[in-house]
Amino acid sequence: MYGIEYTTVLLYLISFVLMSYILKTITKMMDYIIYRITFIIVVLSVLSNAQNYGINLPITGSMDTAYANSTQDNNFLSSTLCLYYPSEAPTQINDNEWKDTLSQLFLTKGWPTGSVYFNEYSNVLEFSIDPKLHCDYNIVLIRFASGEELDISELADLILNEWLCNPMDITLYYYQQTGEANKWISMGSSCTVKVCPLNTQTLGIGCQTTNTATFETVADSEKLAIVDVVDSVNHKLDVTSTTCTIRNCNKLGPRENVAIIQVGGSNILDITANPTTSPQTERMMRVNWKKWWQVFYTVVDYINQIVQVMSKRSRSLDSSSFYYRV
């Protein structure tokens, strides 16, 4: 009897000693692991902090949003500027060194040599089809011409906003505009656009679908036309297809890294007064027409004030933005 009790007590003692040893071993292992992990975290934290020279900014909403950054007070040292001008400008200036001269003048305003790019275009149509807005800031000089007010106004609406567009097959389908942002954009050497609104039975309202002469003309011999019709109503279209293309587009929002300077004209063309344009910061300006040298001098003198109403953007944009946005 006593032997059994001694054996039981001995087993308890052995179990207790064994359990104590196991717990001590586990404790040492855990301490080792914790110390190692803590050491690694401390080392990585030091390394990551040593390399963090950037500014943490929340990325929310549109990429056009203007954020204050470390270069804002350094005269845009890390930015690029594209200046677009009509081909008549270098012809009148007649100086092979004029771009170098302007680059040196921009340098006095804080824009390093090589950060300003000069881009020539021949006419409004060419520029609207292929603008190549690749710089952080893009400023377009447009010479006011009597009779081209509508083309200039619609060019401004086109390049001051982003558009997502798709081709239209007007020979097979009827089309309707679904809201204020939905427009039809027509481009070409001579665009005449006619429409025939349809009722629920696809019969013409005030027009005959089989006779384009009865259609309503909404654009006549224009290079660029942004067509706005009654929303939620099907329309049959007739367009001068040999000299013109038309696309179904949705306005996505302002392209805030673009500004337009109207050269000459008694009044500035204000697209913000257009009921189809959402209120926005004015990025259209006017300078008096004298000579092109005077125009460029004015731009250089006020370049930093002009850029302040714009928002820098890192994406490069070209004509694909208007048609097939990528």
UniProtKB/Swiss-Prot annotation:
User: Which cysteines are disulphide-bonded?
Assistant: 82-135, 165-249, 191-244, 196-207
- Pfam families in the record, alphabetically? VP7 (PF00434)
Please list the residues annotated as glycosylated: 69
> What ranges does the record give for the region LVD motif, renumbered to this chain?
237-239
* Name of this protein: Outer capsid glycoprotein VP7
In which domain of life is the source organism classified? Viruses
Query: What GO MF terms are annotated?
Result: metal ion binding
Keyword ATP-binding appears in the UniProt entry: no
Give the protein family.
Belongs to the rotavirus VP7 family.
Q: Quaternary structure?
A: Homotrimer; disulfide-linked. 2 Ca(2+) ions bound at each subunit interface in the trimer hold the trimer together. Interacts with the intermediate capsid protein VP6. Interacts with the outer capsid protein VP5*.
State the residue spans of region: GPR motif.
253-255
Its annotated compartments are: Virion; Host endoplasmic reticulum lumen
Q: Which residues form the signal peptide?
A: 1-50
Which residues does Ca(2+) 2 bind? 177, 228-229, 231, 301
Keywords noted in UniProt: Calcium, Capsid protein, Disulfide bond, Glycoprotein, Host endoplasmic reticulum, Host-virus interaction, Metal-binding, Outer capsid protein, Signal, T=13 icosahedral capsid protein, Virion
State the function annotated in the UniProt record.
Calcium-binding protein that interacts with rotavirus cell receptors once the initial attachment by VP4 has been achieved. Rotavirus attachment and entry into the host cell probably involves multiple sequential contacts between the outer capsid proteins VP4 and VP7, and the cell receptors. Following entry into the host cell, low intracellular or intravesicular Ca(2+) concentration probably causes the calcium-stabilized VP7 trimers to dissociate from the virion. This step is probably necessary for the membrane-disrupting entry step and the release of VP4, which is locked onto the virion by VP7.
Q: Give the species this sequence originates from.
A: Rotavirus A (strain RVA/Pig/United States/Gottfried/1983/G4P2B[6])
Q: Where is this region: CNP motif?
A: 165-167
InterPro entries, alphabetized: VP7, VP7_1, VP7_2
